[in-house]
Structure formats: structure tokens, C-alpha cells
Amino acid sequence: MEDSKPLSVSEVTRIIKNLISGSKDLKNIWVRGEISNYSKASSGHIYFSLKDAGSLIRCTFFNYSNKNYSGKPLSDGKEIQVYGTITLYEAGGSYNLNVTRVEELGQGDILLQIEKLKQKLAVEGIFDPEKKRRIPSFPKTLGIATSPTGAAIEDIIKISRSRFPGINILIAPCIVQGEDAPDSIVAAIEELNHPNWKVDVIIAGRGGGSFEDLMAFNDEKVVRAYANSRVPIISAVGHQTDVLLSDFAADHFTPTPTAAAEYAIPKEEDVLQFLSQLEGRIKSSLVTKISSNRDRLRLLSGKFIFKEPMQLLNQRSQRVDEIGIRLQKALSNKLNLARVRLERYQNLTSRIQNILFHKKQKAEFWTSKVEDLSPAATMKRGYSILRNENGKIIRSPEETKPEEELQVLLSGGTMQVIRKGK
């Protein structure tokens, strides 16, 4: 035997506890099994064991966790799955599963489907905060979409009437659980959105129920109806859970129908107080405006225009006459200047015509002179032109040869001649 110091029971237990608390595999785990040894203490804590064919584990479901449980009552023999963390009870030296959530078998798949739908709708922007409609401060007409026979509608009407007796209430009855519930809820919301009813705010929901009872408010059609509503919607489903999709799509959600009515409907005394304050502000604003306008009128009445209006009018009239005379003179000067310019243009035109006439006469004279000196005119006076066979003009006898044939150009035509002699 080794000479080591023996451990106390407490020390061993503490070591085991540290090992358990330090293990990630024993934290936030799901465990499934059959309930046995079920009991509920006066403190509200629930104790039971989960067992299968080979083992058993003690479980504690404390009251601060089990008060949110809305499923079917727990009892021995029921198959469930629980979520929690393994802890060690030092005094007894036994380990225990500290339960924070309980689901009936099969609920896990449903929750997974709800989570997938939640993610899909979130991507579409169905839950975006900026799309939320503002709940009116002073609604005239309240619309209610819920079961006509449940406690929820009684609570909503009772609270609404007690807070503001004059509120108009319009009820669109619908089925709130079961296979037909989603279509019924959607129809009720669409009816309350009809413009004829002039509904200012809608409370839609029901009292508490089990996980299965509340499934209609996780239906995609219902969630979209909430999001597409023209009228602001307050979701009011009792025993709120963290997977109720209609709560996320609503413009506001409350944990109970009673809380929804209290949120939607103001107290009559608060409305009267608001109106009184508003009246006071309006009166104060009017008094300030009247006083300001009175001072302005007093200031304006001391000005010259109000003291001697006719004198000012005469001055303005005289000024208009002066401007008219100046305009008349300016127009007359413009016309005279234009007239002088026109006369200048007319004289210039006459001078240009005379110059053109003289230029034409000179051109005709010189044209006549040029024509008189042309070969044709000279030949008309009895002269002729002599050319050799190459067309060269003969100017002297030396340029020809005896017996050479020549061409004579006369005024009336041409003829051929032959040179004779030397």
C-alpha cells in the first residue's frame, strides 16, 4: 500500500463534482426516457426519474423553469425528452439532471420545422422591426380576433370597457386551435381589415394552452396575415413561448389578452388629461399669436402709410406720371433716331443706284469700243485675214511661197487663193 494521504469523502465528492461540472458533454444536453417516481413539492419543484431498459437518472424540474411548461401534465410512464445539465448533489453524493425544458416525444421535430419556417420568414423580412406599424395612442374602434366563447374575449372586453367606456368594439369570431384554426384566424384578420369597419387596432390571440393548442399561431398563413395586415395587430396569446411566430410578426405582442387590452386602450382619465393639456397648449399658442399680431399691428399703425395714406398715394401717382413722361420721351427719341437712320438708308440707296447707272454707261461705252476694234468689225470695213494651210496668219509676202494655196477670211465668209508671181 502506497504511503499517500487518504482523501475524505467530501474531498472525493468535490473532485467528482469538479469533473462533472467541467465536462462539456454533461452540459445543456437532451435526454429521453420514461418518467417514474413523479412528485411535485409544495414549493412548486417537480422531482422524477428518467429510465430506460438499462439505467435510471434522477431529475429536478425547479419551479422557475416548470412554470413556463405548457405541455400536457407529466405523470409516471410518460415518454418525454428533457433538456438540462448534470450536477452533483454533494450532501447525498449522487448526480442529478437539472431540467430546464421538457418536451413530449415528437415535439422536437415540430420545433425544428418551426425554426426552419422562422428562418425562412426572417429572410423575407417578415419580422423586420422597421416594418412594424405604430399602435395608435387613441383608437376609436378596437377589433378582436379570437374565440367567441373563451375567457380571452371576456377579459379583453372587460378591460377595454373599464379603461374607456366609449370605445367601439368589433368582434371577428374565429377558431383558435385545431386543423381549421389557421384559415379561421386569417379570415377574421382580413375581415377586420375591411375599410368599412374603420378598425384602428386589432387584438388577435387566445388564452393559454398546451404546445399543440397554440400551434395555429405558428402556422405560416397566420404569420403572413399578421405581417400583411393594414391595421396594426397586437398578439395576445397566453403563456407566451419562445417559438410563437405570430408574436414576431405582430406589431406588438403581450403575454396575455388582458395585457393586450391594457396596452391598446388608454384610460379615460388619461385621455381627458391629454385633451386638457392639449387645450391649454392651444390656448397658450393663440394668446401668444394674438399678442404678437397686436404688437405688430400697433407698430404698423405708427408708420407713415397708415397716418397719411392719401399723401402717399399722391406721391406714388406723381411718380407714375413722371415715369410715364420719361417713357414717352424715350420712345419719341427712339422713333426719331430710327427715322433719321431710315432716311440715311434711303439716301444711300439712291446714291448706290446712281453709281451703278454711271458704271453701266461706262461699261457699255468701252464694250462698244472693244467691239469696234475686233477682227470681225475690221473685216466689215473691207479688211481680210490671210492664212496658210496650217492656219498661220500671213502678215507679209515673204511668209508665202509661189503657187502656195492660201485661205482668205472675209466678212462674209472664206475663200481659197493661189499666190502667183514671185
UniProtKB/Swiss-Prot annotation:
Q: Which UniProt keywords apply?
A: Cytoplasm, Exonuclease, Hydrolase, Nuclease
Q: Which transformation does this protein catalyse, written as a reaction?
A: Exonucleolytic cleavage in either 5'- to 3'- or 3'- to 5'-direction to yield nucleoside 5'-phosphates
Gene Ontology CC, one term: cytoplasm
- GO molecular function ontology, one term from the record: exodeoxyribonuclease VII activity
Q: Where in the cell is it found?
A: Cytoplasm
Q: Which Gene3D superfamilies match?
A: 2.40.50.1010
Broad class of where this protein is predominantly found: cytoplasm
The GO annotation for biological process reads: DNA catabolic process
The protein's matches in InterPro entries, at most eight in alphabetical order, are given as: Exonuc_VII_L, Exonuc_VII_lsu_C, OB-fold_nuc-bd_dom
CDD domains listed in its UniProt record? ExoVII_LU_OBF
EC code: 3.1.11.6
Q: What class of enzyme is it?
A: hydrolase
One short Pfam name that applies is Exonuc_VII_L
UniProt-listed PANTHER family = EXODEOXYRIBONUCLEASE 7 LARGE SUBUNIT
Description of how the protein assembles with itself and partners: Heterooligomer composed of large and small subunits.
Family listed: Belongs to the XseA family.
Q: Outline what the protein does.
A: Bidirectionally degrades single-stranded DNA into large acid-insoluble oligonucleotides, which are then degraded further into small acid-soluble oligonucleotides.
Name this protein carries in UniProt: Exodeoxyribonuclease 7 large subunit
Native species: Leptospira interrogans serogroup Icterohaemorrhagiae serovar Lai (strain 56601)
Give the source lineage, highest ranks first.
Bacteria, Pseudomonadati, Spirochaetota, Spirochaetia, Leptospirales
